[in-house]
């Protein structure tokens, strides 16, 4: 099986001044994940590395760069899933952690549970020796400004939630195993303790070697209502291609609950899709040593991986 990785940097509205950074960020993440696959590494390792790369990138609403809750604090959710045995690990409402996706994987591999939240997740992180990151180090000036603006009496909640950020990755490795990973800071100015779709298995992501893997982004409550990631895999199990399955599921979410979002998908044959019903979604994929990436509907730039690696080392 030829390895494939697909990543997304969140569906919604990407402001012009952030386009270049967002595009470069998903390309970097895809190249890092593909590097692991190319060396014979697992899909699980590849998606974790890709998502970790975006958590460390302030252009995205995950890890450093996460939006703030109503109290001006960062609370993050993440999930990772192994399609080989349906094992999954997730964390929700976690604070002071630089890479929630790493903690989610530890939940999967070091506990009998699938989801830890808030204080319990914090205690587990301490037990696992994960260093605590001061909350201020996860807050960017952009996130702080958005939080302040959204507190204004005349602010429009629907307007500021158009900038829906989440990061994710799906992959298939040489052994034919699939995996997914998703991480987010959630909704801006959300209630303390709010948990969205990302940490919920079947909503923020799902992976099963029998069909494929999906990672979602968009309005979390809508995604949870239709269990979007699992719905996409169901459509593929009925014979749909990744692209058709993604489009069908997104259309259902839009017509049934009025929700917009985006998805990345890979099936167990290595076919992939990156689809969205929002205005934009940054995405990138590598297959057959070819990098493809874009932000707008219909946009698809392509370059050889070797050339992309040189460009990335020179600052894209």
Task: Show the residue positions of the predicted features.
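Alpha/propeptide regions of enzymes that mature by internal proteolysis
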Residues: 1-316
């Amino acid at each position: 099986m030829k390895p494939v990785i697909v990543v997304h940097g969140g569906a919604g509205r990407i402001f012009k001044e952030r386009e270049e950074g967002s595009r470069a960020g998903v390309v970097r993440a895809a190249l890092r994940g593909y590097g692991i696959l190319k060396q014979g590494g697992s899909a699980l390792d590849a998606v974790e590395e890709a998502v970790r790369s975006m958590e460390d990138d302030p252009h995205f609403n995950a890890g450093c760069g996460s939006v703030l809750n109503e109290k001006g604090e960062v609370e993050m959710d993440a999930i990772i899933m192994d399609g080989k045995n349906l094992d999954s690990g997730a964390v929700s409402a976690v604070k002071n952690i630089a890479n929630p996706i790493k903690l989610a994987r530890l939940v999967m591999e070091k506990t009998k549970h699938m989801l830890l939240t808030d204080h319990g997740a914090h205690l587990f992180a301490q037990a696992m020796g994960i260093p605590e990151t001061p909350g201020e180090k996860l807050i960017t000036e952009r996130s702080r400004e958005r939080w302040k603006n959204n507190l204004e009496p005349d602010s429009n909640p629907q307007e500021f939630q158009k900038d829906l950020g989440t990061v994710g990755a799906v992959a298939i490795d040489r052994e034919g195993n699939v995996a997914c990973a998703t991480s987010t800071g959630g909704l801006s100015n959300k209630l303390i303790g709010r948990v969205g779709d990302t940490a919920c298995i079947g909503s923020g992501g799902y992976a099963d070697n029998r069909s494929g893997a999906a990672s979602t982004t968009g309005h979390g409550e809508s995604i949870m209502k239709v269990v979007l990631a699992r719905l996409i895999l169901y459509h593929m199990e009925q014979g749909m291609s990744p692209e058709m399955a993604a489009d069908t599921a997104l259309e259902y979410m839009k017509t049934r609950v009025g929700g917009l979002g985006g998805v990345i998908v890979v099936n167990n044959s290595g076919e992939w899709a990156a689809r969205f019903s929002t205005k934009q979604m940054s995405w990138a994929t590598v297959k057959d040593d070819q990098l493809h990436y874009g932000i707008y509907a219909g946009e698809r730039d392509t370059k050889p991986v070797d050339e992309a690696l040189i460009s990335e080392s020179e600052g894209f």
